[in-house]
Amino acid sequence: RMAIDAGADVVLGSGPHVTRAVDLYKNRFIAYSLGNFCTYGMFNLDGPKGVAPLLALNINEKGEFISAKVTSIFQQDNEHLVIDPSGKAFQLLKQLTQSDIPEAALQFSEDGIITKKPLKN
């Protein structure tokens, strides 16, 4: 959030080698960690360490979040990237966001799209 306060429009984090929650702050998109997208043999890629979301972000001219299309990826045999038709990375993003940041103003569709929740009147 400090990066957005400093002027960033989007924050894409990495570091813990696992996918983490996503958030919306001041209408800006934050992905706290995108996991292991493509790495080499020394890393254990079992379970959640082996899946990663590939994001196609849609933001407006002001940098405000509109939507994200998530393609779930896994690394096969520590070499090849493969699209995961079961959507494990997307489901993990959804689950972690709903449990870790329940106030996040994001909604997750069944087809891998993240959008802003409608404003309540």
Please give the residue ranges for each predicted region.
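A short C-terminal boundary segment appended to hydrolase-like catalytic domains
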Residues: D46-N121
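Conserved beta-sheet core of the metallophosphoesterase superfamily
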Residues: R1-P53
